[in-house]
Amino acid sequence: MNTLDFVDQSSLRDDVPAFGPGDTVNVHVKVIEGSKERIQVFKGVVLRRQGGGVRETFTVRKESYGVGVERTFPVHSPNIDHIDIVSRGDVRRAKLYYLRELRGKKAKIKEKR
């Protein structure tokens, strides 16, 4: 095992649930404002998951007051408190960039049975 792999192995989180593109998730993010720390929930659809190991990231998209908001999180970040899976999506693509152009009911993802 390489030295960097050993360092990476110690930084990996073991409480990350199995989720993928199309799933609707609640990401509980630790936000530090001054001396206070609070948890902010970001709920949306996972557009992609890329990378591997410590460098693995995922992108979540949501509509907020008619404006699309995307946020990319490192999977093993210490700033993420935890991730809840709201629903599983039934999609055939690994990257759901086409959802950026869709509005309303067309942007809805079928739920996996």
UniProtKB/Swiss-Prot annotation:
Judging by the UniProt lineage, the source's domain of life is Bacteria
- One Gene Ontology biological process: translation
Q: Give TM regions.
A: none
Query: What Pfam families would the database entry show?
Result: Ribosomal_L19
One GO molecular function term? structural constituent of ribosome
What GO cellular component term, any one, is given? cytosolic large ribosomal subunit
Keyword entries, A-Z = Ribonucleoprotein, Ribosomal protein
Q: PROSITE patterns in the record, alphabetically?
A: RIBOSOMAL_L19
Report the function annotation for this chain.
Answer: This protein is located at the 30S-50S ribosomal subunit interface and may play a role in the structure and function of the aminoacyl-tRNA binding site.
What does the similarity note say? Answer: Belongs to the bacterial ribosomal protein bL19 family.
Q: What is this protein called?
A: Large ribosomal subunit protein bL19
Source organism per UniProt: Mycolicibacterium vanbaalenii (strain DSM 7251 / JCM 13017 / BCRC 16820 / KCTC 9966 / NRRL B-24157 / PYR-1) (Mycobacterium vanbaalenii)
